[in-house]
Amino acid sequence: MNVGSNEEAETLRHLFGVRWPLVVRYVEWLSTAGLERGLIGPAEVDRLWERHIANCAALAPLIPVDQRVIDVGSGAGLPGIVLALARPDLEVLLIEAMSRRTAFLREVVADLGLRDVTVENSRAENVACTAPVVTARAVAPLPRLVKNVAHLLEPGGVLLALKGARVWQEVHAAEHLLAKLGYQPGVEVLTVRAVAGQLTVQRDADASNDRRWATVVRVIKQ
């Protein structure tokens, strides 16, 4: 398991700053207890940094300062714990429906000393609180996701969903649902890349995977 290319390592170290040792410890959690408890597949252990940590860290520059964030379907803490490590100014609520995953999250949060991170064992549909930012990764296709989290977003709040190769198919399938669910019209597709040790964000960028860390869908609540 390695951090990836020199540029990826430089960018990650810059992003996490003094919390870098905590990120390393979190990766150790994922590759040991996370693997043993079935939260991380065996094939993922050697690519945790580039496929998971870097991918989740790409959300960090998209969130304004001092925000409350609800991370739905947190699983092993991706992206919620990564965000909390990269952005200590954020207050993060991790929502996870499976008890064994919730137990793992609570152990990790306690071990890393993340005081502004709370874990709730619940389905997103049953959560009553709201936040200006909701994040999601590998939770559901976009049409179902925008429906399940609409009640969690404050007016003007933003849903940030990490997506893969089928992003445009999901966007087209979800667009007709936005108005009836209380979202603003239109979906933004953002590409986050590492350039010269910094993360850059482009809107509707080309499909090239060169230096791409993540593809993020951004939807805004009315």
Curated annotation (Swiss-Prot):
Where in or outside the cell it occurs: the entry states: Cytoplasm
Instruction: Give one GO molecular function term.
Output: rRNA (guanine-N7-)-methyltransferase activity
What GO cellular component is one of the record's annotations?
cytosol
Q: What is its main location?
A: cytoplasm
The record's top EC class is: transferase
**EC number, UniProt record:** 2.1.1.-
Entry superkingdom: Bacteria
Q: Give one Pfam family, short name only.
A: GidB
Function of this protein?
A: Specifically methylates the N7 position of guanine in position 518 of 16S rRNA.
Supply the name of the protein.
Ribosomal RNA small subunit methyltransferase G
